[in-house]
């Protein structure tokens, strides 16, 4: 089995401390911190952090915690607050102006009103190092598990001051893009390049960075990038997601991965919609049986599927502890709704999000972990 590394990109919103609405202030942030890099995104109220390459979940937890604390401190110094949430609960990160760059201006000119409300935030997990052919193999095996991964970080139930009825409204907003959603089965590098060339020729994408599939070969680094998830409410939930994604890639690239499980594109898209709508506390579509099952059943099946790889990397105890914590506390969407039910005030929901975003100084990865075997 390959020695798979991890990296995580987290997108955040900058909020005005008075109105708790998105604030167009990303251009004021420095490009690097001690823990990783910081990038500007499409909406000027967004920033994105990127960890260094990590080999263990403990290292990843440490880097993510440090990045969040550094960005929150930087935001506070400039009069803003940092929120890890899929969509802005109050106000909107759009409509334009978009971030002032030639690429983003061209996107606005080309796609028009699709740009509106695209100040949404996700958590992107990179697993590497993989060449293109290997990343495609891993992505094909991972497709059926995308609805389960989406469940883990549903974190966008409120938008423009009201409950959307979805656990992940970000998923719905993001699906407006022509090349967003579950990826197609891609059988070779030649097939991949053919699909990309067709999308470019049609104008559906301007470049390979606009392949907004839920899993894709990264266009910048030699990884498989899984981008199905909302911005994780907490560092723990981001680490849980990353551990399970690496587990899936590890199974796909093992000596006996089994054949790619065939899943019809329409069924997979419906299953992802179902996960985004009902969330972790509801019911989701099992793409194997075509039946609705309690969402936690999908997650439990996922953990059992990747258990050998989790054991190999020493991640099983940590993943089990993180899942137990999530099961006890509920998903981020549920936690936000409980705050609103108690206070009947969307501002209290945002305050809750802000508290969850920044980890305590003494935060550590739950669960006992051992070093990977040789």
Swiss-Prot record:
Q: What does the UniProt keyword field contain?
A: ATP-binding, Ligase, Nucleotide-binding
Q: What class of enzyme is it?
A: ligase
Q: What is this protein called in UniProt?
A: Putative glutamate--cysteine ligase 2-1
Q: Which residues form a coiled coil?
A: none
Q: Which family does it belong to?
A: Belongs to the glutamate--cysteine ligase type 2 family. YbdK subfamily.
A GO biological process of this protein is: modified amino acid biosynthetic process
GO molecular-function term, one example from the UniProt record? glutamate-cysteine ligase activity
Q: NCBIfam families this protein is in?
A: gshA_cyan_rel (TIGR02050), PRK13517.1-1 (NF010041)
User: What reaction(s) does this enzyme catalyze?
Assistant: L-cysteine + L-glutamate + ATP = gamma-L-glutamyl-L-cysteine + ADP + phosphate + H(+)
InterPro entries reported in the protein's UniProt record: GCL_type2/YbdK_subfam, GCS2, Gln_synth/guanido_kin_cat_dom, YbdK
């Amino acid at each position: 089995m390959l020695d798979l590394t991890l990296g995580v990109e987290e997108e955040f919103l900058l909020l005005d401390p008075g109105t708790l609405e998105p604030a167009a202030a990303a251009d004021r942030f420095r490009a690097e911190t001690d823990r990783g890099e910081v990038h500007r995104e499409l909406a000027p109220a967004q920033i994105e952090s990127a960890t260094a390459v990590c080999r263990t979940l403990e290292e990843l937890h440490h880097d993510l915690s440090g990045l969040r604390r550094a960005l929150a401190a930087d935001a506070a110094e400039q009069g803003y607050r940092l929120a890890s949430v899929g969509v802005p609960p109050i106000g909107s990160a759009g409509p334009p102006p978009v971030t002032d760059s030639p690429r983003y201006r061209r996107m606005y000119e080309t796609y028009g009103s699709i740009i509106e409300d695209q100040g949404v935030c996700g958590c992107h997990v990179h697993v590497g190092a993989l060449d293109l052919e290997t990343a495609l193999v891993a992505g094909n095996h991972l497709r059926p598990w995308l609805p389960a991964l989406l469940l883990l970080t549903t974190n966008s139930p409120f938008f423009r001051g009201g409950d959307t009825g979805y656990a992940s409204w970000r998923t719905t907003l993001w699906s407006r893009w022509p090349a967003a959603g579950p990826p197609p089965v891609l059988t070779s590098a030649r097939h991949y390049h053919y699909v990309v060339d067709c999308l470019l020729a049609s104008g559906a994408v301007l470049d390979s960075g606009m392949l907004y599939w839920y899993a894709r070969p990264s266009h910048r680094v030699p990884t498989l990038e899984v981008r199905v998830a909302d911005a994780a409410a907490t560092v723990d939930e981001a680490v849980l997601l990353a551990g399970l994604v690496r587990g899936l890639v590890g199974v796909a690239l093992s000596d006996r991965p089994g054949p790619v499980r065939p899943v019809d594109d329409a069924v997979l898209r419906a299953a992802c919609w179902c996960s985004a709508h009902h969330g972790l506390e509801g019911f989701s579509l099992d793409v194997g049986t075509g039946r609705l099952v309690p969402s936690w059943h999908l997650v439990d099946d996922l953990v059992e599927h990747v258990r050998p790889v989790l054991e190999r990397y020493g991640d099983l105890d940590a993943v089990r502890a993180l899942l137990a914590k999530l099961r006890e506390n509920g998903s981020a969407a549920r936690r936000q709704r409980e705050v609103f039910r108690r206070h009947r005030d969307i501002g209290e929901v945002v305050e809750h999000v802000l508290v969850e975003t920044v980890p305590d100084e003494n935060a550590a990865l739950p669960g006992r972990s051992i070093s990977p075997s040789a």
